[in-house]
Amino acid sequence: MSTITAVWAREILDSRGNPTVEVEVVLESGATGRAAVPSGASTGTREALELRDGDKDRYKGKGVQVAVANVREEIAEALVGQDALRQVNIDNILIELDGTENKERLGANAMLGVSMAVARAGANLLGIPLYQYLGGVNGKLLPVPLMNIINGGEHAPNNLDIQEFMIMPIGAETFAEALRMGAEIFHTLKGLLAADGHNTAVGDEGGFAPNLESHAQAFEYIMKAIEAAGYRPGADVALAIDAAASEFYKDGKYVLAGEGKEFDAQGMIDFYTDFVERFPLISIEDGLAEGDWEGWKKMTDDLGEKIQLVGDDLFVTNPEILAEGIEQGACNSILIKLNQIGTLTETLDTMELAKTAGYTNVVSHRSGETSDHFIADLAVGLNAGQIKTGSLCRSDRLAKYNQLLRIEEDLEDDGIYYGPALKEAFFGED
């Protein structure tokens, strides 16, 4: 009943209008699984390779027909007849079939689409929710969303170098309440920006993309929006950023072109420390460049006891690189992106290693997304506690939030929203 009988792929478009891979898997029972693969804009150099066609006359070189063909032919031939319920075996077959360290032969986009679709087919075969299939009977933690409401960097055509300014509704009692808080703050922020004559167009992930005087002004607008929406900064809503510092690291310096400033690693740490002292900022992702290991160790020494320091480009969801970071004392958290590593099994291995080492897991989308909401189930099933999936507009972002609403409803009283625990960890009790 769980034997794979067919594997198929097609080229679809993501939220930026670029091609990506969608895979369907059919089992002997008739159960099916479908999955679509996301794509990033600011990427780590050690990520698994996303295979693109390179034909400039078609989708400006971004087509994925080769990856699709790899699924339809070589991968399908290897997996037909295999047991879909043996996820580790399926993923090991994919890894061995590819035979490269960074999945450049078959493409991480081809492999991940298959890996995710097989998991969905398995869940559908057993008639259980995907989150339960991934995490077992103990998957019950509804994650705190890191909601990206101001975009900059590679995600927006404005003068902000920091890529994402986010809010975290830690004062909510349920995920549904957290989502409502985020939406109310988002719409309040829009009104404040518009009233001051700022552009309220949105970036790739749905956050506003205004030209502002400084990064501090972005924080100030968000603080005003929180208060104007009727909430308390810190007590109800915390702040987070994704600096994506590798994108503005030039010739050994961190160049904040929008503010006309340049820093070494210590200068950048001091820059962030000022924000931590002035605002309820509890999480900084990619605050330094991916190759600046010495800087990361210093930043962890300086700020690691106070806030969450998240490695994204630094770790690229790779368990071997994470192990190196743990040994060196860099960061205290990891961003989890399925397409950085290319299979579900390797993703779960990375999350387990992080948790064992006392690092937090933040499950994440990519800037080029689809309506697939796999990561919502992953976050709950693995009790990650945090999810980063964009702003409060664009259906590709809301697909994940809406799935979390469904999961919370399905869990009923067994579901636990992680906000109060996170609030107590950073701010204590009211």
From Swiss-Prot:
User: Superkingdom of this entry's organism?
Assistant: Bacteria
Positions binding Mg(2+) in this chain are 242, 285, 312
**What does the cofactor section's free text say about binding?**
Binds a second Mg(2+) ion via substrate during catalysis.
Q: Where does (2R)-2-phosphoglycerate bind?
A: 163, 337, 366-367, 388
Q: Which GO terms describe its molecular function?
A: magnesium ion binding; phosphopyruvate hydratase activity
Q: What is its EC number?
A: 4.2.1.11
Pathway(s) served: Carbohydrate degradation; glycolysis; pyruvate from D-glyceraldehyde 3-phosphate: step 4/5
What's the catalysed reaction?
(2R)-2-phosphoglycerate = phosphoenolpyruvate + H2O
Entry's InterPro entries? Enolase (IPR000941), Enolase-like_C_sf (IPR036849), Enolase-like_N (IPR029017), Enolase_C (IPR020810), Enolase_CS (IPR020809), Enolase_N (IPR020811)
Q: By its UniProt entry, which Gene3D superfamilies does this protein fall under?
A: Enolase-like C-terminal domain, Enolase-like, N-terminal domain
Q: Name one GO cellular component term.
A: cell surface
- Predominant localisation class: cytoplasm
Cited SUPFAM superfamilies: Enolase C-terminal domain-like (SSF51604), Enolase N-terminal domain-like (SSF54826)
Residues annotated as catalytic: 205, 337
Task: Report the locations given in the UniProt record.
Answer: Cytoplasm; Secreted; Cell surface
The cofactors required by this protein are: Mg(2+)
Q: Which UniProt keywords apply?
A: Cytoplasm, Glycolysis, Lyase, Magnesium, Metal-binding, Secreted
**Job description of the protein:** Catalyzes the reversible conversion of 2-phosphoglycerate (2-PG) into phosphoenolpyruvate (PEP). It is essential for the degradation of carbohydrates via glycolysis.
Q: Which family does it belong to?
A: Belongs to the enolase family.
Q: What is this protein called?
A: Enolase
Point out the gene that encodes the protein.
Answer: eno
